[in-house]
Each structure stands twice: as C-alpha cells, then as structure tokens.
Amino acid sequence: MEILPVGEESLGVRSMCLYVETRDVRILFDAGVSLAPRRFGLPPHPRELERARAVRSEILRLAAAADVITVSHYHRDHFTPWYPSVYMATDGETYRQIYGGKRVLLKSPDDLNWSQRRRHYGLSKALGDAGAELIYADGGEWRVGGTVIKASQSLWHGPAGSKTGRVVAFAVLDGEERLAFVPDVEGPVEPEPVAFLKEVRPTIAVVGGPPTYLPWDIEAAIRHLREVVDLAPRVLVVAHHALRSGDWREKLAPLFEYAEKRGVEIATYASLRGVGEELLEASRKELYKREPAEALVFEEEEE
C-alpha cells in the first residue's frame, strides 16, 4: 500500500485529501481544498492562495489516476464544488475534471441537516451531469481484487447533536496493511469513531483531531486518542482541525507522551510527506507582518 498526503493544515490549507494505492485500486480520499475566508480578522495571505492552487493542481493530477474518489461529508474542504471559487481554487469546470467518469463513494443525505443536504443536492446533480457513478457509502463494503474498502456507519462531525452535521469514515484493507481514514470527528470526541477503529485495527490511522483553536473538550479527545494508540497502529496521523493552532503539540502533549511509551509514532500529513509543517492559517497574522500584502477579500456565494 502506498500513501501520499495531498492537502491538509500541516501542508498549508484546509483539507484532508489523501491518495492511497494498492495492487488493485487507486483511491483519492476527499478531493477538496479550501481556505478560511477570515482568521484573526484577516483574509487569506497570498501565500495561502498560492498553496491552495498548488494543492488543487495535485488533486487534479491524482484524480486522473484514481479509480475511486470519496466524499466523507459536505463541507467545502472535503469535496470539489461545481462553481468557481478563489478560496477553493476552482473554476466552473474543475469538478468535471475531478469526478468525471469516476466511482464516487459519498455520504448518504438521509441524516444530514438542511445545509449539508442542500450541498449534497448540488454536488450529486453536478456529479451526475459529469458522468460519475454515485454510491452512498454509509456502512458499505466493496472488494476490488484483494483489496477491501469499508465505510463506517454515519458518525457525528464532532459532539453528538453538532450543527456541523455527520460524516462517514473509511478503511482500506490490503493484506497485512490496514488504513483507516476518519475525517472531522474532532477528537474523536465521541466513542463511535473509536469503535470503528477498533473494528478495523489499522496499521495506519488518519484521524481528524480536536479543534485546538476553539474551546473544546481536549481531555475527551485525548482519552479517545489513547484508545486508538492502544490498538497499536504503526502510525497515528493527527490531522485537520487540530493543526489550526500553532501550539497544538503542547495542547496534545499527554497524547505524545502516551504514544511514545507504547512505541506508536504520532505523525502529520507533512511528516508523512517528508517535509516541514507549514501552518499557514495558524500563522496568518504573522505572515502579514513578515510579508506585507494587500488584504484582498473575495465575495463568494455558494451556487
């Protein structure tokens, strides 16, 4: 199994895009990238806009090779929209290049809130027009040669009852290698994502960590992440919301100490790529001080 991190906060953008290739199938998880329109009262710095375009280019390249593309949920950093956006580095045809003719495993709309259901409607219509094969993933399992792709049942995006909606997680089983992709569970702060991980027992676990930049139950997240460490994965990748604060390592220090004692590597998308972390959003204020630039605001409306 080969794994290539594509976009994520440690790589300078909002995303969890990940490319996975086995002997049988090529999967592009959550082919999206976006930037926070405002953080610290500032719009994205030009370096962030440049990075979003670079990540989008890599997503386009890898989508061309992929057999399967996932949409774990309908937040704009996890899919490619059907309309132009500076913050998502798209024009009106980008989605066709990403999804056209592909098999797309996507979150069912059955238990979504109104906002997510609306985005699902727009995206599913666009993907149908692009000739994609749409398969609702929740609780499903697919075999491609010797590789098995599993999807979790619907999970909360954060705490139970969250207004941010629901997601599905995925696992790829390829012989002795088992990868779990568990996006946007924000900790996990609830036990259900941990139950899915215990079912999969991954050798590599990619988990959407707690939003360290917001008031949050960090203790619950660390407790659940310790349970993941107890499954003895070779690598636990802490990703996404956790890395929107420059002091995220300090806030998760008990997890690092626990994992080190048990021989589990805590990694980021950047470290898996063999590059240094660039938390561009977390350092936006410093970027404007260090590299002064006009603060350009782009008014965008979702179609």
Curated annotation (Swiss-Prot):
Stored Pfam families: Lactamase_B_3
Source organism superkingdom: Archaea
Alphabetized GO MF terms: hydrolase activity
Similarity remark: Belongs to the UPF0282 family.
Protein name: UPF0282 protein PAE3680
